[in-house]
């Protein structure tokens, strides 16, 4: 393309931005990407949700003379984009299975005659032989592959139909390709470039940081009640609640509705018209909350979602990041709340182990472990996210639960040096479990076979628990001093940032591992204050006695959450007891008296213990 022509197109980009899309200035990175595409060079764009990825191909589509084809995985995503473009006066259309044959022919005629500038299409439809023949005659000027991480088995949402897109480079060797994603680590990025056959692409990686989103975690205790209270505290704000099964989606939505909250279920098992109705009502603010499986949201461009809840832990950080990214797209404060129970992680791990052995299972295991490390982090959660994506930062954000309510710190320089030195001494070839065994001086054949029992660092940390050293190494990963090489069975490897700590040139504050105190502290925090642990123990003992007499499990009497609240509020009258979550009239009548008597005796200090 001639230089003068490129310059003319580049100046036109600002005009299209202002006149067609109504924005006065480009966001960081957008202009360079657009200029690169207009010059005919391939691009890989990694930009957070709400960061303006779509404009990177929509503006060139309006400046280049011809058809731009956009590969998109979901009908809802296509429809949303096309509706927005048409509202801006752009000749855009999509081809999908919900259209009649007449509608599809009309779209194809528009592509052939040049009336349509942007065509959205699913990968499986695009790759049909007869469609590729049509496309060749239409002389496309740009191919944009949205959600490009779907092409990579290293990605968090691999889709086999995306893998076939690699054949397009042979069919269209000179056509500029653009791949776009919000979530791709370095391995996934390399995979996208290789599998799509991108030629010397510009790789534009924007910051993954969404500073307006507050990342929070609540340990599950009585999850539905915790969720109800959380939603009620939102006071009518718009939100999405993600669950990992259709049944839980239905149950949770019904529970919210029973509390008078405007909520609806959304999952792939519902009829198309029901899903479309829910999506439309949510988009129009006629519905406060959508309770959904992960099928919901990829096509959502609702700017005023104020909170996203993960009622179950996702299988990987990429999914978590993408789904939480649907909050606060207007840049105003928003919150991402993760409900966490280590048992959920154990269940996901069991499910994973039932899958066929192989590289794909290894990838999924690595990603699941990273998600678990995020949930159990004792350092700034935003740092965990950003360092996972390779965006090295060491300054805590001040806007997550860890920063707002920090765990106790200690001078971890010596522990860090032991861990970092051990990683280096075993040649950065081994995973966390093995490194911890060396640190603690484990006496096993594998360590002896490698001669690692002869290392100076062997056994230097035997005075501390396995959990302690796992916590230390996880924190070093979160702080960007250590990485896990997914391609080498999650081997621990040192970064440049580790050098000054290893040399003793800088000290390092680490969080005291909350191995024992974590659960009680999380529960105490969830229920809004301190509770009397001695009284709690007595209440549990009484509950066990009553449950045994009644031949029911203890939780049928009162669950632990209710007992903690009793130990916090110390109710000694019927009205006070009824104010405790989990105590209704029937349970008050049946079990109330002995519990109130025990609490009264404890308060008066004249109980037996």
From Swiss-Prot:
Family: Belongs to the helicase family. RecQ subfamily.
Location of the Helicase C-terminal domain: 223-371
Record-given protein name: ATP-dependent DNA helicase RecQ
Keywords: ATP-binding, DNA damage, DNA recombination, DNA repair, DNA-binding, Helicase, Hydrolase, Isomerase, Manganese, Metal-binding, Nucleotide-binding, SOS response, Zinc
Domain named HRDC: residues: 529-609
Phylogenetic lineage: Bacteria, Pseudomonadati, Pseudomonadota, Gammaproteobacteria, Enterobacterales
Activity regulation note: Helicase activity on dsDNA is inhibited by ATP-gamma-S. Helicase activity on dsDNA is inhibited by porphyrin derivative meso-tetra (N-methyl-4-pyridyl) porphine tetra tosylate (T4) at 20 uM but not inhibited by N-methyl mesoporphyrin IX (NMM). Helicase activity on G-quadruplex DNA is inhibited by porphyrin derivatives T4 (2 uM) and NMM (0.2 uM) but not by ATP-gamma-S.
Cofactor(s) the protein needs: Mg(2+); Zn(2+)
Dependence of activity on temperature: Optimum temperature is 50 degrees Celsius, able to efficiently unwind Holliday junction DNA at 55 degrees Celsius.
Disruption phenotype: Increased sensitivity to UV light and recombination deficient in a recBC sbeB background, partially resistant to thymineless death. Increased genetic instability of G-quadruplex DNA; a double recG-recQ deletion shows 10-fold increased genetic instability.
Positions that bind Zn(2+): 380, 397, 400, 403
Cited function: An ATP-dependent DNA helicase which unwinds DNA in a 3'-5' direction. ATPase activity is stimulated by single-stranded (ss)DNA but only very poorly by double-stranded (ds)DNA. Binds to and unwinds a wide variety of substrates including 3- and 4-way junctions (including Holliday junctions, HJ), flayed duplexes, 5'- and 3'-overhangs and blunt end duplexes. HJ DNA unwinding is stimulated by single-stranded binding protein (SSB). Unwinds G-quadruplex DNA. Unlike yeast SGS1 or human BLM, is equally active on dsDNA versus G-quadruplex substrates.
Cofactor binding, note field: Requires Mg(2+) for helicase activity on dsDNA and G-quadruplex DNA; Mn(2+) and Ca(2+) also support unwinding.
PANTHER family: ATP-DEPENDENT DNA HELICASE Q1 (PTHR13710:SF105), DNA HELICASE RECQ FAMILY MEMBER (PTHR13710)
Domain Helicase ATP-binding: 34-202
UniProt short sequence motif DEAH box, positions renumbered to this chain: 146-149
Induction: By mitomycin C and UV irradiation under the regulation of the SOS system.
Positions bound to ATP: 23, 27, 30, 50-54
Annotated consequence of substituting residue 543 to A: Over 10-fold decrease in ssDNA binding by HRDC fragment
Coiled-coil zones: none
Gene Ontology molecular function: 3'-5' DNA helicase activity; ATP binding; ATP hydrolysis activity; ATP-dependent activity, acting on DNA; catalytic activity, acting on a nucleic acid; DNA binding; DNA helicase activity; four-way junction helicase activity
């Amino acid at each position: 393309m001639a230089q003068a022509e490129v310059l003319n197109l580049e100046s036109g980009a600002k005009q299209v931005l202002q006149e067609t899309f109504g924005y006065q200035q480009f966001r960081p990175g957008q202009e360079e990407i657009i200029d690169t595409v207009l010059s005919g060079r391939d691009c890989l764009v990694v930009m957070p949700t709400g960061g303006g990825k779509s404009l990177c191909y929509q503006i060139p589509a309006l400046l280049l003379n011809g058809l731009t084809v956009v590969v998109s995985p979901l009908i809802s995503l296509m429809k949303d984009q096309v509706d927005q473009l048409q509202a801006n006066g752009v000749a855009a259309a999509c081809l999908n299975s919900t259209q009649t044959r007449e509608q599809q022919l009309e779209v194809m005629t528009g592509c052939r005659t040049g009336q349509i500038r942007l065509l959205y299409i699913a990968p499986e439809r695009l790759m049909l032989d007869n469609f590729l023949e049509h496309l060749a005659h239409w002389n496309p000027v740009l191919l944009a592959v949205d959600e490009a991480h779907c092409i990579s088995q290293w990605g968090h949402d691999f889709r086999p139909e995306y893998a076939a897109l690699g054949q397009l480079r042979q069919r269209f060797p000179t056509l500029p390709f653009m791949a776009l994603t919000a979530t791709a680590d370095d391995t996934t990025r390399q995979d996208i470039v290789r599998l799509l056959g991108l030629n010397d692409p510009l790789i534009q990686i924007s910051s993954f940081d969404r500073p307006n989103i507050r990342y929070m975690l609540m340990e599950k205790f009585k999850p539905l009640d915790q969720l109800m209270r959380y939603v009620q505290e939102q006071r009518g704000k718009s939100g999405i609640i993600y669950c990992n099964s259709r049944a839980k989606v239905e149950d949770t939505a019904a529970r919210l509705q029973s509390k008078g909250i405007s909520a609806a279920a959304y999952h792939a098992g519902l009829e198309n018209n029901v899903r479309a109705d829910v999506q439309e009502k949510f988009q129009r603010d006629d519905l406060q909350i959508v309770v959904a499986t992960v099928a919901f949201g990829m096509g959502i461009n609702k700017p005023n979602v104020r909170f996203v809840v993960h009622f179950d832990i996702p299988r990987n950080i990429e999914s978590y990041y993408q789904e939480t990214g649907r909050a606060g797209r207007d840049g105003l404060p928003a919150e991402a709340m993760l409900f966490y129970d280590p048992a959920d992680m154990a269940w996901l791990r069991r499910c994973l182990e039932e899958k066929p052995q192989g590289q794909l299972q290894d990838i999924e295991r690595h990603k699941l472990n990273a998600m678990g490390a995020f949930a159990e982090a004792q350092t700034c959660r935003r740092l965990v996210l950003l360092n996972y994506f390779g965006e090295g930062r060491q300054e805590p954000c001040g806007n997550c639960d860890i920063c707002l309510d920090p765990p106790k710190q200690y001078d971890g320089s010596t522990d860090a040096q032991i861990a970092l030195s051990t990683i280096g001494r075993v040649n950065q070839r081994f995973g966390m479990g093995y490194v911890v065994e060396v640190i603690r001086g484990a006496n096993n054949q594998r360590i002896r076979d490698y001669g690692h029992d002869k290392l100076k660092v062997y056994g230097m940390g035997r005075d501390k628990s396995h959990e302690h050293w796992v916590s230390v190494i996880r924190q070093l990963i979160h702080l960007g001093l250590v990485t896990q090489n997914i391609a080498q069975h999650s081997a621990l490897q040192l970064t440049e940032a580790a050098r000054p700590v290893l040399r003793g040139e800088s000290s390092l504050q680490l969080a005291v591992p909350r191995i024992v105190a974590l659960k009680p502290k999380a529960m105490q925090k969830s229920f809004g204050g301190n509770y009397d642990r001695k009284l709690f123990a007595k209440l549990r003992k009484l509950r066990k006695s009553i449950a045994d007499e009644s031949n029911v499990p203890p939780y049928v009497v009162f669950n632990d959450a209710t007992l903690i609240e009793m130990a916090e509020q110390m109710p000694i009258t019927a009205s006070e007891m009824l104010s405790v979550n989990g105590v209704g009239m029937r349970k008050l009548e049946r079990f109330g008296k002995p519990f109130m008597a025990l609490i009264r005796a404890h308060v008066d200090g004249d109980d037996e213990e």
